[in-house]
């Protein structure tokens, strides 16, 4: 039997999603908790591998098991063994052909940013921070140059293992909520560090360091050295994958209502 689970987590204490020999990853903690609940080893496949310090609101994983339990038993039972900064939000039985990563038709990220003369304290680790004022108009103008199918080589990390740098960036939404900004990105898939590299560039435009057209020039050049430095991971949230509606899998969790 194949199950799909939705997870929320704070990534600050972990070295990303993917399992590592030292065990200090979200996947390691999740699989340890699942194994304790199921009383046998459990392996998971995720929709999107988040980096160190990056959070998730609706990370989706699938697993195969012979254990027959009610879906919510998997939620409550696994959460019993998880640390406070990781929680299973939902569980659904799925067809054996379902694949958390390969079945996704898109993915969404949000970056939560504080604009303030003083660094965050209560929100430390949960938001990015800038102290120089931002202007939404040039940032939105710059973002428009990125929409569509492009070679995003200028925004991938040197460690990126993606077979192709060509991705379809469908939407960038920039919203201000008081002292906070929310940048939302939707694409077919993302390259390693792509959102954080885009954030660095958009902020350079928003602070008047660069003109909006500069981002189009960086994109066309395909040279990472032409772009801004990679921005901090603190405010980056994997909102989750998007699947065909007939799968009837949740695309929201309660944590979505926490974001401004």
UniProtKB/Swiss-Prot annotation:
GO molecular function, one term: RNA binding
UniProt entry keywords in alphabetical sequence: Isomerase, tRNA processing
EC number: 5.4.99.12
Broadest EC class assigned to this enzyme: isomerase
Catalytic activity: uridine(38/39/40) in tRNA = pseudouridine(38/39/40) in tRNA
Domain of life: Bacteria
Active site per UniProt: 51 (nucleophile)
A Pfam family assignment: PseudoU_synth_1
Residues that, per the record, bind substrate: 109
GO BP terms in the entry: tRNA pseudouridine synthesis
Family classification: Belongs to the tRNA pseudouridine synthase TruA family.
Chain's role: Formation of pseudouridine at positions 38, 39 and 40 in the anticodon stem and loop of transfer RNAs.
Complexes and interactors: Homodimer.
Name under which the protein is recorded: tRNA pseudouridine synthase A
Gene that produces this protein: truA
């Amino acid at each position: 039997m194949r199950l799909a689970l939705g997870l929320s987590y704070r990534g600050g204490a972990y070295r990303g999603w993917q399992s590592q020999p030292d065990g200090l990853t979200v996947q390691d903690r999740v699989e340890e908790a699942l194994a304790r609940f199921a009383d046998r080893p459990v392996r998971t496949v995720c929709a999107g591998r988040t980096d160190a310090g990056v959070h998730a609101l609706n990370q989706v994983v699938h697993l195969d098991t012979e254990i027959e339990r009610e879906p919510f038993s998997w939620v409550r039972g696994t959460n019993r063994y998880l640390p406070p900064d990781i929680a299973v939000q939902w569980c659904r039985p799925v067809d054996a052909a379902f694949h958390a990563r390969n079945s996704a038709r898109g993915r969404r990220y949000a970056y939560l940013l504080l604009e303030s003369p003083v660094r965050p304290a209560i929100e430390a680790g949960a938001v990015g921070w800038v102290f120089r004022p931002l202007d939404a108009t040039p940032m939105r103008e710059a973002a428009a140059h990125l929409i569509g199918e492009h070679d995003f080589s200028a925004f991938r990390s040197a460690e990126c293992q993606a077979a192709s740098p060509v991705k379809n960036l469908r939407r960038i939404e920039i919203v201000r909520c008081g002292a906070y900004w929310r940048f939302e990105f939707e694409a077919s898939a993302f390259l390693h560090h792509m959102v954080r590299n885009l954030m660095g560039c958009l902020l350079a435009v928003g602070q008047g360091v660069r003109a909006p057209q500069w981002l189009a020039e960086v994109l066309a050049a395909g040279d990472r050295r032409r772009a801004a430095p990679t921005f901090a991971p603190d405010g980056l949230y994997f909102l989750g994958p998007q699947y065909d509606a007939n799968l009837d899998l949740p695309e929201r969790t309660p944590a979505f209502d926490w974001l401004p």
